[in-house]
Design a protein with these regions (language model features):
Chain A
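Tight coil/turn sites that cap or link beta-strands
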Residues: 62-66, 126-127, 133-135, 145
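Conserved short histidine dyad/triad with adjacent acidic residue
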Residues: 58-75, 92-96
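His/acidic/aromatic-lined binding-pocket segments of jelly-roll/cupin-type domains
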Residues: 69-71, 76-81, 122, 130
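A short, N-terminal "cap"/entry segment at the start of jelly-roll beta-barrel domains
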Residues: 1-60, 67-69, 166-169
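Short hydrophobic/aromatic-rich beta-strand segments that constitute the beta-sheet cores
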Residues: 88-90, 151
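Short acidic-glycine-tyrosine-enriched beta hairpin
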Residues: 93-136
Length: 169, 346
């Protein structure tokens, strides 16, 4: 048996084809259907647009353009590069509790450059997933034009929800 | 792991000469009796003093059974088809026939019974072990495993059945966590993903931070998955689990959620048939392409169709309190309530 269609189709900002919902007896809003490339194409740089929400847990889509602010969290987060190339700087905060105490969830923006030891640098391309370890400060730097990130985190003060704008209705 | 032999024997004793003319063992769990022959699996139960029977193609049944076992009965309901399935009650498992089929239900011909999860697991593993012939891999796409599921009993395929589900603690590739997939640990790139770049991220960790500065090539990891429709966990944020998986052909079960779950399509396309959870009435058809994100409401059952092997990120909230909160109506079954009129501020 031959399967000649050997090309794997990933999406990108320049090339994505959104799917859709054929309603039989339903309401499209039940599916909160969006597309991360479309969301990123309409977002401000590093705006944390919530595309998935399960109680307090969220998936955020970020438009990676230029260099982001520094963020940290009281818990692990993770990021997947869906398009582009991104570098991540990591700093072990001397006093992480001061910025993100254990009872505060979600990514917290640092008001000043991080105080602590440099942990390292990660260079990511499409399809790569990185750990954003708890207690570390991180920032993203897009190194090849505009990229798209997907962040696994918890709803926080900088999370932006605009379901009516991003979803099929 | 194939179930401990003492339990298999216990079941054999229920039916002293249990091997039928096709060579397969018969199994009984409470009032449910399971048997297979060359092509089919037969499930029998009693309701209203009548004997009821339901027949499924053996490959469909075995593929569903494999997922039910591998997923440890998963979240909520695993419908093998419109009639038979299991409901996870998290330490107990309910087996049902006709319970979520409007006609069986209406006629009072449905049946369900609860068992200890470990007992059902043992029995299902024994069933899988006995009913899977040499050469048949219920995790593989049909084109990869052929028609060896057919015919009289012939041997075993324990290597295929005993794959461990890969669940990371923090992220694959970290010291002490699940290893990355390579040719060397026998995860070759799947035939459908030969074009997926295999470059790993460049990591420059300062001394002392090697165990925490970590990233890996998720798409390459998935390109080497040797199973279909079997999520593995690749990142954890408290109860939030990223469970990516590779999908080809048809999801062997109709999964019904006891909570909302989310999909992020990473590559290619899957079409989801969505039905009402309790009745199976069609609700919608959802087509997801690379980059699409969608919620699967907590009151549906869904089955996916993937024309070519695709990468799907299943996102789960593993909070054990959720089933009760949805059941009690404290949480709404979908996010529809989050939608605001355009321009309003949240
Ligand atoms: Fe599901």
């Amino acid at each position: 048996m031959s399967f000649t269609d050997t090309k794997t189709v990933f999406g990108s900002l320049d090339s994505y084809v959104k799917g859709g919902i054929e309603v039989i007896d339903d309401d499209r809003r039940h599916y909160a259907f969006s597309n991360v490339f479309e969301v990123a194409s309409l977002a401000k740089p590093y705006e944390k647009v919530v595309v998935g929400k399960n109680l307090r847990y969220v998936i955020e889509t970020l438009r990676a353009e230029g260099t982001s602010d520094w963020f940290t969290a009281s818990h692990d987060e993770s990021v997947i590069v869906m398009d582009g190339s991104v570098e991540i700087d990591l700093v072990k905060l001397d006093d992480p509790e001061r910025i993100a105490p254990a009872h505060i969830e979600g990514s917290i923006r640092l008001e000043a450059p991080p105080q602590g030891r440099r942990m390292g640098l990660m260079k990511l391309r499409r399809g790569h997933q990185a750990l954003l370890p708890k207690g570390a400060a991180y920032r993203f730097r897009s190194t090849d034009g505009v990229g798209v990130l997907v962040l696994q985190t918890i709803h926080g003060p900088h999370s932006v929800e605009k379901w009516s704008e991003i979803c099929l209705t | 792991m194939v179930g401990d032999l003492s339990d298999v024997r216990a079941m054999e004793q229920d039916f002293p000469s249990t091997r039928n003319e096709s060579g397969y063992q018969r199994f009984r769990l409470g009032d449910f009796v399971f048997s297979r022959d060359e092509y089919f699996v037969h499930i029998e139960w009693r309701a209203q003093g009548k004997k009821l029977s339901h027949t499924m193609s053996a490959d469909v049944f075995l593929r569903a059974l494999m997922r039910d076992v591998a997923w440890n009965f998963f979240y909520g309901w695993v419908n093998f088809d419109d009639v038979f399935g299991t409901r996870n009650r998290y330490d107990r498992v309910e087996l049902y026939a006709g319970r979520y089929h409007p006609v069986y239900k209406e006629q009072g011909l449905d049946h369900s019974a609860c068992f200890d999860s470990s007992f059902v697991m043992q029995a299902f593993r024994s069933m899988l072990d006995d009913w899977t012939n040499v050469g048949y891999d219920p995790f593989a796409a049909p084109a990869e495993t052929g028609l060896t599921w057919q015919g009289k009993k012939q041997g075993h395929n324990r290597a295929a059945l005993n794959r461990a589900r890969e669940s990371c603690r923090r992220m694959p590739g970290l010291p002490g966590d699940v290893p990355l997939r390579t040719d060397r640990n026998r995860y070759p790139i799947n035939r459908a993903f030969l074009d997926v770049p295999q470059d790993e991220p460049v990591i420059e960790a300062e001394p002392g931070f090697e165990h925490e500065v970590h990233a890996f090539n998720l798409f390459a990891y998935l390109s080497r998955s040797d199973v279909t429709w079997n999520p593995s966990v690749t990142s954890v944020c408290k109860h939030s689990l990223f469970c990516p998986t590779t999908e080809e052909y048809i999801l062997p079960v109709k999964h019904a959620n006891d909570r909302i779950e989310w999909f992020l399509q990473l590559s290619d396309q899957i079409e989801w048939r969505i039905e009402d959870r309790a009745t199976g009435r069609p609700r919608a058809s959802v087509v997801m392409r690379a980059g699409d994100v969608a919620a699967m409401p907590a009151d549906i059952r869904h089955q996916g169709f993937s024309r070519r092997r695709s990468m799907l990120l299943v996102w789960e909230n593993a909070d054990p309190r959720l089933p009760q909160l949805y059941e009690d109506g404290i949480l709404p079954p979908s996010l529809a309530g989050e939608f605001q009129e355009p321009g309003s501020v949240k």
